[in-house]
Amino acid sequence: IAKHYDLSPMRGAHLMGQAHHESGGFKKVSEGLYYSTPERIQAVWPSRFATVEDAEPYAKNPEKLADKVYGGRMGNKGQGYLWRGRGFLQLTGRDNYRKFAGEMRLPEVMTNPDLAANEYAFETALWFFEANKLFKIADEGVTDDTIRRITKRVNGGYHGLDDRMEQTRKINTWLMAG
């Protein structure tokens, strides 16, 4: 796999630094959408929940929350929970699953999306980097700017930027030493 994607140390550092953060240290390969308080929901998705009261019905209800935040976009037709984030970079949305399954010749992912969390967690991350031209950015070096730009594409914002920077730099040091 690494040969197919020509994983240089810089590319590997960016990929693994982002994956480390998104997966909680490579421990979480399926998006956890169980939030016990509406305050936390509103803090995580302020653009979807203007007030804490708006988030109240979604606390302790991951399926309902996923349908609210992911339903009707990214190719989802009200099936946000089915197409929630999975894999080391949290592949999200029916459109992304469809593209991944097609380009990687893994049609079974469309009938069993949990495969993206289990058997293909690393492949989803590689595919996402390639499909979104993130390896091209990674080739520019391991800098604040490149980590920030890749984070924006992976996360849609800058959530966890400090950790992503720390992990990417640490992994880059290890890979460059070897």
Task: Describe these PLM feature segments.
Residues 4, 21-31, 156-164:
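Secretory-pathway/luminal and periplasmic proteins that interact with or process carbohydrate-rich
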Residues 16-19, 101, 125-126, 151, ...:
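Non-transmembrane alpha-helical segments in soluble domains
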Residues 7-11, 81-84, 120-121, 143-147:
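Extracellular/periplasmic catalytic domains that process cell-envelope and extracellular macromolecules
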Residues 159-177:
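Extracellular low-complexity, O-glycosylation-prone Ser/Thr/Pro/Gly-rich "stalks"
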Residues 120-122, 131-134, 138:
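Proteins synthesized as precursors that undergo proteolytic processing into mature forms
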Residues 19-22, 139-160:
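Acidic helix/loop microenvironments that form the catalytic cleft of cell-wall polysaccharide enzymes
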Residues 9-24:
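Active-site-adjacent structural elements in enzyme catalytic domains
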Residues 20-128:
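Peptidoglycan-targeting cell-wall enzymes and recognition modules
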